[in-house]
């Protein structure tokens, strides 16, 4: 029984000593850092949080109130976790800002390039439009030599024919200047026309000369059967082709003449008085049989 009582007394003493250790400085007046290791760990954690706050000031240039409150007010693990989250958020905010700055620098350059490309395209379209307009004007405007007859009315054409003559048996190498010089003494020459075959491009051997007045036509008839480039030319007033008129100045129907002209080789003696040298023989197979006779 004595052994049991001694064991019980020892356990009671140990229990009392444990209560004194938990009580801390209020019971014995000692420093909590000596008997309570948890108290010393809390101070060290606060010092570490302060050091981390100072480092964040050097990196970010400023500290938010949330860092200090998170470091001192929270527990050891909670304060450190909140500080790391705040630092990560600041880094994430700074990085997008840098990227946004780079984009703002590149965007004006791209816009300038696009604007320049648009200007070049507009200039190209304007040039195409100008070229099309010039081509249309060139196609619509006839040559100066053909502009007059195209716009002339029937009355004007008849009046011009009354001032013109037909010159036959003209040398194939003759030019308009030579014909104008040959008839220059008869009056002022307004225009000289030498007709050519549309298939071969060779001259047909006759020409038209238009004077400025009708008196010159009567004067030019004196040059009938005169020599021009070694040939005896035929000079007669130009006849105006009128629609609906089937007769000619020769006194026989025009349709009858054309029907016989298709076989002019067998009846060439009939027309030999008008044309000393039938010119239809030069264009064998290609020139029309009527080209040597029809002056108009």
Curated annotation (Swiss-Prot):
Pfam families: RRM_1
GO biological process, one term: positive regulation of polynucleotide adenylyltransferase activity
Bias type Acidic residues, positions: 84-97
Annotated disulfide bonds: none
Highest rank taxon of the organism: Eukaryota
One CC-aspect GO term: ribonucleoprotein complex
Positions with biased composition (Gly residues): 71-82
Region (Disordered): 1-106
Region ranges (Necessary for homooligomerization): 146-296
Tissue expression remark: Shows dynamic spatial expression throughout development. First expressed in the animal pole region of the egg and this pattern persists through to the blastula stage. In gastrula and neurula embryos, expressed mainly in ectodermal, neural and epidermal regions. Neural tissue-specific expression pattern persists into tailbud stage when expression is localized to the brain and spinal cord. At early tadpole stage, expression becomes gradually confined to the specific vesicle regions of the developing brain. At stage 39, expressed in the telencephalon and mesencephalon regions of the brain.
RRM domain boundaries: 163-240
Entry's transmembrane regions: none
Subunit details: Monomer and homooligomer. Binds RNA as a monomer and oligomerizes when bound to poly(A).
Domain notes: The RRM domain is essential for specific adenine bases recognition in the poly(A) tail but not sufficient for poly(A) binding.
Protein name listed in UniProt: Polyadenylate-binding protein 2-A
Organism field: Xenopus laevis (African clawed frog)
Gene giving rise to this polypeptide: pabpn1-a
């Amino acid at each position: 029984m004595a052994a049991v009582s001694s064991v019980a007394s020892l356990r009671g003493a140990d229990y009392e000593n444990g209560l004194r250790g938990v009580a801390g400085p209020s019971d014995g007046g000692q420093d909590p850092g000596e008997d309570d290791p948890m108290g010393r760990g809390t101070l060290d954690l606060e010092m570490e949080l302060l050091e981390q706050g100072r480092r964040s000031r050097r990196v970010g240039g400023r500290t938010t109130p949330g860092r200090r409150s998170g470091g001192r007010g929270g527990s050891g693990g909670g304060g450190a976790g909140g500080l790391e989250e705040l630092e990560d958020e600041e880094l994430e905010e700074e990085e997008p800002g840098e990227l946004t700055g780079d984009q703002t620098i590149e965007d004006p350059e791209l816009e300038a390039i696009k604007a320049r490309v648009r200007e070049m395209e507009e200039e190209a379209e304007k040039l195409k439009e100008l070229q099309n307009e010039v081509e249309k004007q060139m196609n619509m405007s006839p040559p100066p030599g053909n502009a007059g007859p195209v716009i002339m009315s029937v009355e004007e054409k008849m009046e011009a024919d009354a001032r013109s003559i037909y010159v036959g048996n003209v040398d194939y190498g003759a030019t308009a200047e030579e014909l104008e010089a040959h008839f220059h003494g008869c009056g002022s020459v307004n225009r000289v026309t030498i007709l050519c075959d549309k298939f071969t491009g060779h001259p047909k051997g006759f020409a038209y000369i238009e004077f400025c007045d009708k008196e010159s036509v009567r004067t030019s008839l004196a040059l009938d059967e005169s020599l021009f480039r070694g040939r005896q030319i035929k000079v007669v007033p130009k006849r105006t082709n009128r629609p609906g008129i089937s007769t000619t100045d020769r006194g026989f129907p025009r349709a009858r003449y054309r029907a016989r002209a298709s076989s002019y080789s067998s009846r060439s003696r009939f027309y030999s008085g008008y044309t000393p040298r039938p010119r239809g023989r030069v264009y064998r197979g290609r020139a029309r049989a009527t080209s040597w006779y029809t002056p108009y």
